[in-house]
From Swiss-Prot:
Gene: G
UniProt name for this protein: Glycoprotein G
SUPFAM superfamilies: Sialidases
Function, in words: Interacts with host ephrinB2/EFNB2 or ephrin B3/EFNB3 to provide virion attachment to target cell. This attachment induces virion internalization predominantly through clathrin-mediated endocytosis.
Single GO cellular component term: virion membrane
Organism: Nipah virus
Amino acid sequence: MPAENKKVRFENTTSDKGKIPSKVIKSYYGTMDIKKINEGLLDSKILSAFNTVIALLGSIVIIVMNIMIIQNYTRSTDNQAVIKDALQGIQQQIKGLADKIGTEIGPKVSLIDTSSTITIPANIGLLGSKISQSTASINENVNEKCKFTLPPLKIHECNISCPNPLPFREYRPQTEGVSNLVGLPNNICLQKTSNQILKPKLISYTLPVVGQSGTCITDPLLAMDEGYFAYSHLERIGSCSRGVSKQRIIGVGEVLDRGDEVPSLFMTNVWTPPNPNTVYHCSAVYNNEFYYVLCAVSTVGDPILNSTYWSGSLMMTRLAVKPKSNGGGYNQHQLALRSIEKGRYDKVMPYGPSGIKQGDTLYFPAVGFLVRTEFKYNDSNCPITKCQYSKPENCRLSMGIRPNSHYILRSGLLKYNLSDGENPKVVFIEISDQRLSIGSPSKIYDSLGQPVFYQASFSWDTMIKFGDVLTVNPLVVNWRNNTVISRPGQSQCPRFNTCPEICWEGVYNDAFLIDRINWISAGVFLDSNQTAENPVFTVFKDNEILYRAQLASEDTNAQKTITNCFLLKNKIWCISLVEIYDTGDNVIRPKLFAVKIPEQCT
């Protein structure tokens, strides 16, 4: 796709540029950082990083001096053996220096970057929020007791000299009143209405980035469970699809009510992988105050696009949502994967934002790479009876990213048992053949007492694909027959297409079930026929859209959307992450919207 094209072609790769809309929604969203800021510890780490830099500079000076000595020596002698030994010594010094840069400088520079861009802004924002809440409470008391009205305190307009803010050391966020959707149905509007009853609220949040113009924030992940969340993104400079990978953020935290009865997020623990350009397609599952994050590791680029050359390596990281001071391996821990049981598949990897736990077992959404010649499918099962131009072989040929690709892709789950002890492994479980389409990003989550599975529509079956999980192993889904939600598309697979064709295009826009009796769900979808634009928060049934709210202007480009719904003080709320092009600098960045599901239809 041409970089200069302002419309986003609806393809499976992130486009380089979006258009600058006429209407810009201002916000800064991302991740608040570590709630415990130990100022002395922070200073000591920064000092340690500074000392390391000085030591490395000294090493460089010594190496340069050695080279100068050798140059002088070569002018006065022909002893090539001595010169060779000296050069080998310098090579060893350079290798040691490079190793030290990778193992010592990189992480400490990342520490400084994280501290300056996440920790300090997060706690200043939190302190300001607490001050605003306190002053509002004081005003209410004075107004009630004294029978006159105090003007609101405008913190940023006070003509006083304010001291530098101290770290908010004593704050301990607690997840109160936040829970999963369980039990009996909640009271929500069940009727179709054109009234603007949805009131999306942009969550004001500080992005954990350097913030320079042109930084593209892509490949976002947002998982939520039991009042805790995991978040991840990749930063690129120069281009959203081919730019230089600067850093990947993987963090966890709590869903909070900051005093205004609107859910927000407070990040408590952040990890930045040392090699961000090798980490792809992370997925997170919560269990007992930890998030387990499973990622693909690749040195040849995206494993989906470079599957033939990808080694199949995976990485598991455990992050504590309530980290301890000096917690070390408790707070952030790399888990060894002794084996990967792939069955008949060549390679497998996580593919989708989040999964579920059942007892001691974690299930991550995944995709398997199967050699095309080993894929057995009866073409007579291809649903073409109502399609005039579709061919029986189209179902089979559309299972790869190209008709002649070496691998076909199948969705499924990766199972990880926490009780495996010293021999941890992941096991791939493939999805059943019913309503089969190419493997794509998916999500499995618990809602109202039963797991629900969503799979992105990346091929000819463009209608939303989700339903109750009947069995996990093997993975069998009772797919809903939805007729109102579809994704934009071009070529052979346009919006609302249901005839088997050979294509590979689509986007991840999941839905969260909020009422099981009436099968009502909520999510953000792109209300456009051909281009990825116009994100709209929508509450819908299988055959009817009940009510909706636009999150940006109609021509605002957007892509991936992730929605998680939960109870906050017995009210249904949803938080939606939206990849969106409306920041004013021609790059895509995610935003968070909080939406309360209304009880009344008026």
